[in-house]
Structures are given as structure tokens and as C-alpha cells.
């Protein structure tokens, strides 16, 4: 199961109350105030974890609850702080705060068609980043703090403050340098397996890829890039047909788009129409995404009719950068890897 968006409830701990207490000891019948401070409530924290691939950990238990701080004690002893809770999220997670005060209210708003207002509060892309989703409440001060020359026996102490809470939406947008875009059965999964260490499911029927898959492409001289393969796009994807939005959002961070076309025209497809339609879907979904650099991978060049279709394709799109390949037998893969290195390759330290 792959989960790339989820609604959760989060609540930080309440601060412990300060204590009203007076020192009582042998030979000290009227000791001064000694009430300690309450402990701070635990916070709810999100941490970007490189080993977390999606948001499935929140699917069956969509809540993060921190513990309350403990009240102050006598002898000026500070109450124990509440324990913070840390939720692991993958790189590329966007956090939204909703206007719903509870999960029940959020469900009601959705069911009644009222709509939920969302405020973007974080875009977590850097590994190791910690983001405080809900701040724990502060512990109250004990009566020891309220002593004065005119009030040596204060009976006042502070209450701990409430911790923050709310309903939040988390959305995963994969982080990749290049995104493979194409129709179902265009050969994207086979291609990703050829150029990287990814092991996507491959079969000769459409929609083999049912979730975004990330592959790391290693080059010479300690260089690499990250490539995302999203499930095949269909007409109307920009309107969320076929869960288009669920898939397209995973390539919004890509620096270059790679349109993978079945140049042999298998299943009666026309490569020229395919490119035009794919470009249209991308533009209708996001003008900014459509402005990103792109090139075409002409796949299935080992099949009958591919050479003739490629010649017609070049005549129709004379300025488009085209790399002919056969993902099945490996022809053209080296040239594709070189192009990716030129466009988005970067140095890394092992």
C-alpha cells in the first residue's frame, strides 16, 4: 500500500500546574513558599527521514499525541516535562493546517460539501529537518516565584498553558531531478530499471505502475541523479481523471521532464498525437511545470514501424531533442544516461 496524502490529528501536551506549597520542617513551623514549577508539555514534531518512503505509518493510526507536563512539587522541585512525540515523514512532504478543530468536524465539512480551508505551513525537503507541528504548553510557576517583601506567604501559583492542537493534512510530492512522463504501457518502468537500480514491476499490460517509483542513476566521477516514474497519464489527467492529480504532483519538483513515447505505435497509438496530448495535460495542470526543460525518448525502436514513425515525428517536431532507444534490448541507453548527466547530474559523496 502506498499512501501519499493523509489527514491527521495532532495535540501537544498541556503544561503542568505550578504548586502552592510552604516549607514544613522541624523547628521551622512557618517556612516560606517552596512550590515548584510545572513541567512543560511535550511537543508534536515531524522529522524528515530518508528511510521513510510514504505516509502509510499514519494510515491506521492518524494521530500524534504528546504527553502533559507534570505539576510542580514541594521543595521547589520542578515537575517532569511531558514527552514529545516524533512522526517520521519522507522528503518532499508538504504540511497544511486545516480550519477544522477535530477529525469529526473535518469529516463533516467534507461530507456536507462545505470544504476545508487549508493553510500551507511547511514544505519538508531536507533530510534530518525537524518541524514543530504543535508546541507543548508551558508549565506554570509555583508560589515560590510570587514572594515579596509585602507578601511572604503567597497563595498564588500559575496554571500550565494548553498545548497546541489541530487537524493537519500531509501531502507527499516526490523529490526527483527528472520525471518520466508517458501513456500506460509506453515502457517507462522497463526504462527506469535499465538506467537505475530501481526494480519496478514490469508487464505487458497498461497501468503496471500504480504508484510513483524513484530510481537513482549513477554516473562516472561520483555523479548521480534521481529519476521518478509516475503511473501512466491518460487524457483528462489535469482534471484528476484517472487520479491524474495524485500522479502529476509527484513531478512538480522535477528539473527536467522526459516524455517516453511508444514510437512503434503499438496498440494503435500515434506518437505525434501522444506528445501533443501529454504536453497539453502538463500545461493544463501547471503552467510552471510546462515551462521546465524537456526532451523525448523514442522507445520501442526495435519494433516494426518505429523507424518510419520516427522519421515522421522528426519532420513534425524538428526542434525537439529526441533520443531513440529500445528499453527492451538496451539500445540507446548510454546516450540517455549521458543526457541526464548533462542536464541534472550532480556530484555526491559516498
Curated annotation (Swiss-Prot):
Residues 176-345 form the OBG-type G domain. Keywords: Cytoplasm, GTP-binding, Hydrolase, Magnesium, Metal-binding, Nucleotide-binding. Residues 1-175 form the Obg domain. GO terms for molecular function: GTP binding; GTPase activity; magnesium ion binding. Its EC number is 3.6.5.-. PROSITE patterns: G_OBG, OBG. GTP binds at residues 182-189, 207-211, 229-232, 299-302, 326-328. GO terms for cellular component: cytoplasm. Pfam families: GTP1_OBG, MMR_HSR1. The keyword Cytoplasm applies. It is an enzyme of class 3 (hydrolase). It is found in: Cytoplasm. Mg(2+) binds at residues 189, 209. Its main location: cytoplasm. Its cofactor is Mg(2+). Monomer. Belongs to the TRAFAC class OBG-HflX-like GTPase superfamily. OBG GTPase family. This is GTPase Obg. It comes from Akkermansia muciniphila (strain ATCC BAA-835 / DSM 22959 / JCM 33894 / BCRC 81048 / CCUG 64013 / CIP 107961 / Muc). The lineage of its organism: Bacteria, Pseudomonadati, Verrucomicrobiota, Verrucomicrobiia, Verrucomicrobiales.
